[in-house]
């Protein structure tokens, strides 16, 4: 499947659920305690990270989405730390403070990248607290595209059916990361994302792929879900919908250090992608890739857009050089910019590649780190050059160009001028051969407006494709 990242900055998401603070105490272990057969950890690092539903919100914000976060907190120092933690990263908190309950905290002690123990500080919230939180959240539905219900069974989401129905009636998609053995609580949700253990807790042991699909479709019908995405660890993900064939997406994780927060990453990437306009299969592929990134990190973590671009390029074959599509080239350029590389771009028909072309392209490449050559397709060459042209089809012209040491990427375009593709890619330097005036070069104004440069290079005298063709015809 070809995967393209949508414009995450357009996504407007509300996350409602169990917020918590993930606290990490880290240090070396050098001896066993004389008091009990346990290691002694000398703490030299303390770190607080927003967890649970707050980690979902942070993932959305890190991808570039606009996100509000509704949850239950206590009136304590932990709530203050959690508030600062989410606000610093661009999340807008919408807390309901409960005086007699602590803000949920999970303390993990780590040494040598291994978790030794986890200590939980929490008390279950009352049902009335959940009712108030969901009622408070209803007022936010008119300004968002997607709701995420992040349920950790701590009491923030008790009976959300009415809230789900109201959101759906307003055209808002509702995604649920479920908990417990009763998925009926989420009746009418757009999508639920159980892991395999959560899925089997509801439907019983899954004995085969066919059994999984049958049981998933049974849940769709029973609870009026639009889709179920079952996350399956090393087996990847399986998407089941009512009106389309199932979709199996293999895992892309290379190394697994810590699965903490992987489910949060999946639903946050789904929500951000869908809110930004991606279709469901695309959103699932993006979420699967994001999960593969985050499990390679230690502790509760987020995934950035740049990390997603790099991972998608690696796993979907879109990071290479040579002949590429526009979308593939857009991915590659984001990586090049991340590496601080200067990108040069030129264009032409290059119908019969000759020594003048080779010299010109070497000059162009010398002006930067990477060179893009945009090539007119066959129809546009015919319109520009007339009958009998091109001599070589576009795939052959691009293959020859891609074989030159000076050329990094070759991309086709179908218009008579490259203005549109140049305006999309916006190289650091646009070059053109001949006696053009800079103001007359297609795409030049867009490059300059974006902070780039435009330069005219000379061709070698006496060498041209037209002259070569005429010489061939004269000698026949």
From Swiss-Prot:
One Pfam family here: CTP_transf_like
Q: Name one GO cellular component term.
A: cytosol
Which UniProt keywords are present, listed alphabetically? ATP-binding, Carbohydrate metabolism, Kinase, Multifunctional enzyme, Nucleotide-binding, Nucleotidyltransferase, Transferase
> Which Enzyme Commission number(s) are on file for it?
2.7.1.167, 2.7.7.70
The reaction(s) annotated as catalysed by this protein in its Swiss-Prot or TrEMBL entry are: D-glycero-beta-D-manno-heptose 7-phosphate + ATP = D-glycero-beta-D-manno-heptose 1,7-bisphosphate + ADP + H(+); D-glycero-beta-D-manno-heptose 1-phosphate + ATP + H(+) = ADP-D-glycero-beta-D-manno-heptose + diphosphate
Q: Which residues of this UniProt protein bind ATP? A: 195-198
Q: Where is this region: Cytidylyltransferase?
A: 345-476
Name a single GO biological process: ADP-L-glycero-beta-D-manno-heptose biosynthetic process
Q: PROSITE patterns, per this entry?
A: PFKB_KINASES_1, PFKB_KINASES_2
Active site annotation, chain numbering: 264
Q: What molecular functions are annotated in GO for this chain?
A: ATP binding; heptose 7-phosphate kinase activity; heptose-1-phosphate adenylyltransferase activity; phosphotransferase activity, alcohol group as acceptor
Associated pathway: Nucleotide-sugar biosynthesis; ADP-L-glycero-beta-D-manno-heptose biosynthesis; ADP-L-glycero-beta-D-manno-heptose from D-glycero-beta-D-manno-heptose 7-phosphate: step 1/4; Nucleotide-sugar biosynthesis; ADP-L-glycero-beta-D-manno-heptose biosynthesis; ADP-L-glycero-beta-D-manno-heptose from D-glycero-beta-D-manno-heptose 7-phosphate: step 3/4
| Region described as Ribokinase: spans on this chain | 1-319
Q: Which Gene3D superfamilies match?
A: 3.40.1190.20, HUPs
User: Per the similarity annotation, which family is this?
Assistant: In the N-terminal section; belongs to the carbohydrate kinase PfkB family.
Q: How does it assemble?
A: Homodimer.
Its biological purpose is as follows: Catalyzes the ADP transfer from ATP to D-glycero-beta-D-manno-heptose 1-phosphate, yielding ADP-D-glycero-beta-D-manno-heptose.
PANTHER family, per the entry: BIFUNCTIONAL PROTEIN HLDE
HAMAP family per the UniProt record, alphabetical: HldE (MF_01603)
- Kindly provide the name given to this protein in its UniProt entry: Bifunctional protein HldE
Please tell me the species this chain comes from. Answer: Shewanella sp. (strain W3-18-1)
């Amino acid at each position: 499947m070809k995967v393209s990242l949508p414009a995450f900055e357009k996504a407007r998401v509300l996350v409602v659920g169990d917020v918590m603070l993930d606290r990490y105490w880290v240090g070396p272990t050098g001896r066993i305690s004389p008091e009990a057969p346990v290691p002694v950890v000398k703490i030299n690092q303390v770190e607080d990270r927003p967890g649970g539903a707050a980690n979902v919100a942070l993932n959305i914000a890190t991808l570039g989405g606009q996100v509000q976060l509704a949850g239950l907190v206590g009136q304590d120092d932990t709530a203050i730390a959690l508030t600062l933690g989410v606000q610093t990263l661009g999340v807008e908190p919408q807390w309901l403070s409960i005086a007699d309950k602590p803000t949920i905290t999970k303390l993990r002690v780590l040494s040598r990248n291994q978790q030794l123990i986890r200590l939980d500080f929490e008390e279950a919230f009352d049902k009335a607290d959940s009712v108030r939180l969901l009622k408070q959240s209803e007022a936010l539905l008119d300004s968002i595209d997607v709701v995420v219900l992040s349920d950790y069974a701590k009491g923030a989401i008790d009976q959300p059916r009415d809230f789900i129905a109201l959101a759906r009636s307003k055209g808002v998609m509702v995604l649920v990361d479920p908990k417990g053995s009763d998925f009926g609580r989420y009746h009418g949700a757009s999508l639920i994302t159980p892991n395999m253990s959560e899925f089997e807790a509801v439907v019983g042991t899954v004995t085969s792929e066919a059994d999984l699909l049958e049981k998933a479709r049974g849940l769709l019908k029973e609870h009026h879900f639009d889709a179920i995405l079952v996350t399956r660890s090393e087996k990847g993900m399986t998407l089941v919908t009512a009106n389309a064939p199932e979709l199996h997406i293999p895992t892309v994780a290379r190394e697994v250090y810590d699965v903490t927060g992987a489910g949060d990453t999946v639903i946050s990437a789904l929500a951000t992608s869908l809110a930004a306009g991606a279709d469901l299969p695309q959103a699932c592929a993006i979420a699967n890739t994001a999960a593969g990134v985050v499990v390679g990190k230690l502790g509760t973590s987020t995934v950035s857009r740049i990390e997603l671009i790099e991972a998608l390029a690696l796993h979907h074959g879109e990071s290479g050089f040579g002949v590429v599509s526009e979308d593939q080239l857009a991915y590659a350029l984001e990586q090049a910019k991340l590496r601080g590389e200067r990108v040069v771009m030129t264009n032409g028909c290059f119908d019969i590649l000759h020594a003048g072309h080779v010299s010109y392209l070497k000059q162009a490449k010398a002006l930067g780190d990477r060179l893009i050559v945009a090539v007119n397709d066959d129809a546009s060459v015919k319109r520009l050059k007339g009958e009998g042209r091109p001599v070589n089809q576009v795939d052959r012209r691009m293959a020859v160009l891609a074989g030159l040491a000076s050329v990094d990427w070759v991309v086709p375009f179908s218009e008579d001028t490259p203005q549109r593709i140049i305006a999309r890619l916006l190289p650091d330097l646009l070059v053109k051969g001949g006696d053009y005036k800079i103001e007359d070069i297609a795409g030049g104004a867009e490059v300059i407006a974006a902070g780039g440069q435009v330069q005219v290079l000379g061709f070698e005298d006496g060498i041209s494709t037209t002259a070569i063709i005429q010489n061939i015809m004269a000698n026949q």
